[in-house]
A protein has these predicted regions:
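A short, structured surface patch at a secondary-structure boundary
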Residues: 91-150, 154-155, 159-163, 314-316
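Structured C-terminal subdomain patch of bacterial secreted/periplasmic proteins
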Residues: 197-206, 308-377
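Short helices/loops that flank or line small-molecule/ion binding pockets
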Residues: 141-154, 169-172, 177, 293-302
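Second-shell loop/turn segments in exported
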Residues: 80-81, 133-134, 158-162, 191-197, ...
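Extracytoplasmic ligand-binding site segments that recognize negatively charged/polar headgroups
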Residues: 112-116, 161-169, 179-209, 242-269, ...
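Alpha-helical, coiled-coil/dimerization segments enriched in small aliphatic residues
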Residues: 262-290
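Short helix-initiation/N-cap motifs at beta->coil->alpha
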Residues: 69-71, 129-143, 187, 287-294
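Bacterial Sec-exported substrate-binding components of ABC uptake systems
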Residues: 2-36, 43-96, 212-252, 372-377
């Protein structure tokens, strides 16, 4: 019995020791497991942080200095996150760069149709500082109080009036308040256009500068490369044409009036579109963006093609109706009888936003126009 009792005592002792060992082992396992999970979570957070940094441009951002149309040099210390954009053409560039989430506000509500339909939802969600768009109202500058109320870390403009109009905040005033600004080179920058516009370098410089400012240079290069490929596909066919083989084109901006037409000269974006597409602007000898001419001068230059340009109405049906209205004016105007483009009804169609405003859609305009010109030479 004593022997049996001692055996049971030893058995209980060994069982207790094993239980303690298992408890200690399980505790160690649990601690190790928790540590492993924590490490995974921390690694995941770090990866997410790095991914977010790459996505928003903050990862490894080095301060840069960028120079704009006015020669204003702005130091960008970190990618802007609360941007105010004062003109639709520059807003569109940001949208092509997938930077719509950085826009805190726009100046005036964009005119319907002025931006691609694909961006409509994003644009509708952006607050306007100068109120709703009103047809014929002209540019409404953003008052100082309204602009500063959104605490912008960057202000972007496309026209000098964005900063110079009465009531607008100047770039100097913005700088005094510690807010950098940038006036685009490709929209209406006279100082940047010192020779005829025959390409899209100014657009590419703006896109590249915006890519640097926001820390997304790779996105900018993809957008630029997409434009280059479209342009190259046309230049491969039209680039070798002699001037005499290029159809002459009168770019007619219908919405600017019909009594005395505005003739885009060689400093205007549409000149680059026409030249790249394989045509010749009949007013390409004018070293200015626009000049008012009489219809008799259009008749004297006798264009082979009239490029009808209208403001985008926001839908294909509305645009077609407006193009048809413009073409009806041309074919019924007594002043234009005998003009080759009119008698042959050789009309090409482009919306103003892709043809006459420097931007990403210029490359699409080139492709569209080239198709029409190839059968009109």
């Amino acid at each position: 019995m004593h022997v049996l009792a001692r055996w049971f005592d030893r058995r209980r002792s060994r069982t207790a020791d094993v239980s303690r060992d298992r408890a200690g082992h399980n505790g160690t396992v649990r601690v190790a497991a928790v540590a492993a999970v924590a490490a995974v979570l921390l690694a995941g957070c770090a990866d997410a942080s790095r991914s977010q940094g790459r996505a928003d441009g903050t990862s490894g951002f080095t301060p840069i200095t960028v120079t704009d149309c006015n020669g204003v040099e702005s130091v960008i210390k970190s990618p802007p996150k609360r941007v105010v954009v004062l003109t639709p053409s520059v807003l569109e560039m940001l949208l092509w760069l997938d930077l719509g989430d950085r826009v805190a506000a726009i100046g005036q509500e964009p005119r319907p149709g002025s931006l691609p339909q694909r961006f409509a939802e994003q644009v509708a969600a952006i607050p306007s500082l100068s109120g709703k768009y009103t047809a014929g109202s002209g540019y409404k500058p953003v008052p100082r109080e309204e602009l500063l109320s959104v605490e912008p870390d960057l202000v972007l403009g496309g026209f000098g009036s964005n900063f110079d109009a009465a009531g607008a905040m100047s770039q100097k005033e913005l700088a005094t308040d510690g807010i950098p600004s940038y006036l685009a080179l490709s929209t209406a920058c006279r100082s940047a256009v010192t020779a005829p516009r025959t390409g899209f370098d100014l657009v590419w410089r703006d896109v590249e500068n915006l890519g640097r400012i926001f820390g997304v240079p790779d996105r900018a290069q993809r957008v630029i490369e997409g434009m280059r490929q479209k342009v190259a596909s046309v230049r491969a066919k039209a680039g070798g044409l002699k001037d005499t083989a290029r159809p002459t084109v009168f770019p007619f901006e219908y919405d600017e009036g019909t009594t005395t037409p505005y003739a885009p000269g060689n400093r205007q974006a549409v000149n680059a579109v026409i030249e790249t597409a394989g045509g010749r602007n009949v007013f390409g000898d004018r070293d200015e963006a626009y000049t008012k001419v009489g219809w008799e001068e259009v008749v004297a230059r006798d264009p082979q093609v009239i490029l009808v340009i209208v403001y985008d109405r926001g839908s294909p049906a509305a645009n077609d109706a407006h193009f048809a209205e413009a073409e009806k004016f041309l074919v019924t105007s007594p002043a234009l009888r005998g003009v080759r483009a009119v008698t042959g009804k050789r009309f090409a169609r482009l919306v103003y936003e892709s043809a006459s405003v420097g931007g990403v859609r210029n490359a699409d305009a080139v492709v569209e126009l080239a198709g029409r010109l190839s059968s009109a030479g």
